[in-house]
């Protein structure tokens, strides 16, 4: 049946906690690159594939069928099982005896986490009145920015375990610190899964309109291909850079300036949390102001400007000779960069008819996750190997990725400004 506003708020709070936990389990590997490399004899490229491709393969692809499943069966069960599955997979990372085992465990993390957002979006859409849904979704999506806590919490866990030395577990015996860290961050999963069952699942609202047939949706994309190529290319290029930053800046600070994982995570986590939140709000505010002034291509124009603003800090930050200078420029980069995601999603929504907007958003998230996450984490060590001799020149590789991604993203957005304005005008007249 219907749920009260209080019950809706309880569910929203639980989903936000689950979303934050998912980022902790997803990102903690980036704080333990060096010990994992030494213990398993891995290269930077192999670690990059663990952070990106291994996670993204199932995370990106499974999200769409999970969303369809969430429209048919209990979303509470889907979310609870997903939380337990990704937490168990995170724990299995700590027991991995080879690269293949660790790769498969990371795939399991991606598979479990794919259950959360589609089901939570569906749940919240039924729990909140339409007038309050935007605010609820905004609060849930704060998990992306609050995901900066993943670095704070994860770094503290890694440092704590490292200071205590090897941990001895019954049956398994002594465990290296990085393995124990995976086990510790996996533990809250059981509690979060139990909390999901506290929330009361709302009845599903009747869908007043059927989705656009696949042929018609593809026809719309084809008729406005210049618009969609510009949006998808811009957002995918920026996501490649963004995932590269998340995956390799902790290693850059640890390897280049001898910071501990806890020290690196504290600095980067606070930047993500504070400046990332400000950037997200600023991007949306700028696009809204331009739209109110009659600029029809406001969202795409803002992401073009964001790409240009990111160019110099993305190029210079990883080349700085001191951690202080690096972090100042990284803070600017984070402030500018975080405004793109919301504007890109809004651009997609305005360029698609109402009955195919879920399809447009799903394709957007698929491209950002599968291409951005897979390539973004692997391209840094690939460039290091191809251009800098594979000597661990992560800073130079990050600078190269930043320069190329921002320039190409700006060009992609610029190329679609005129067609984008025409597309949204066409959609508005339907």
Language-model segments: residues:
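Juxtamembrane intracellular "pre-TM" segments in multi-pass secondary transporters
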Residues: 1-4, 201-231, 256
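Helix-breaking motifs and short loop linkers at transmembrane-helix boundaries and internal kinks
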Residues: 41, 74, 95-101, 129, ...
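Conserved MFS/SLC helix-loop-helix module at the cytosolic interface between two early adjacent transmembrane helices
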Residues: 61-97
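Glycine-rich segments within core transmembrane alpha-helices of 12-TM secondary carriers
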Residues: 137-159, 272-280, 365-377
């Amino acid at each position: 049946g219907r749920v009260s506003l209080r019950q809706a708020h309880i569910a929203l709070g639980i989903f936000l906690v689950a979303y934050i936990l998912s980022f902790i389990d997803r990102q903690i590997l980036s704080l333990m690159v060096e010990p994992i490399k030494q213990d398993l004899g891995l290269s930077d490229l192999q670690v990059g594939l663990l952070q990106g491709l291994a996670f993204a393969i199932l995370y990106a692809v499974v999200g769409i069928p999970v969303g369809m499943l969430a429209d048919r069966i209990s979303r509470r069960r889907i979310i609870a099982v997903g939380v337990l599955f990704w937490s168990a997979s995170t724990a299995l990372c700590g027991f991995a005896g080879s690269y293949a085992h660790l790769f498969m465990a990371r795939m399991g993390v991606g598979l479990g986490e794919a259950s959360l957002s589609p089901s939570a979006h569906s749940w919240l859409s039924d729990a909140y009145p339409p007038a309050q849904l935007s605010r609820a979704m905004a609060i849930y999506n704060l998990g992306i920015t609050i995901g900066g806590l993943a670095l704070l919490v994860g770094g503290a866990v890694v440092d704590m375990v490292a200071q205590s030395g090897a941990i001895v577990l019954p049956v398994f015996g002594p465990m290296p610190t990085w393995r124990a860290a995976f086990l510790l961050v996996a533990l809250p999963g059981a509690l979060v899964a139990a909390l999901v069952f506290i929330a009361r699942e709302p009845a599903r609202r009747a869908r007043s309109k059927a989705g656009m047939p696949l042929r018609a949706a593809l026809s719309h994309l084809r008729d406005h291909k210049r618009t969609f190529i510009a949006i998808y290319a811009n957002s995918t290029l920026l996501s490649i850079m963004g995932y590269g930053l998340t995956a390799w800046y902790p290693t850059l600070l640890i390897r280049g300036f001898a910071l501990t994982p806890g020290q690196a995570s504290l600095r980067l986590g606070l930047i993500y949390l504070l400046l990332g939140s400000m950037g997200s709000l600023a991007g949306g505010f700028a696009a809204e102001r331009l739209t109110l002034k009659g600029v029809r291509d406001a969202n795409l124009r803002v992401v073009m400007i964001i790409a240009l603003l990111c160019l110099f800090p993305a190029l210079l930050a990883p080349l700085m000779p001191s951690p202080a200078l690096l972090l100042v420029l990284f803070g600017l980069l984070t402030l500018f960069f975080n405004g793109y995601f919301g504007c890109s999603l809004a651009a997609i929504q305005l360029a698609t008819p109402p009955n195919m907007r879920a399809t447009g958003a799903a394709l957007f998230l698929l491209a950002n996750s599968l291409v951005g996450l897979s390539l973004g984490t692997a391209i840094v060590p690939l460039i290091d190997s191809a251009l800098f001799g594979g000597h661990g020149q992560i800073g130079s590789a990050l600078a190269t990725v930043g320069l190329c991604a921002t320039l190409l993203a700006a060009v992609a957005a610029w190329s679609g400004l005129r067609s984008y304005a025409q597309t949204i005008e066409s959609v508005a007249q339907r």
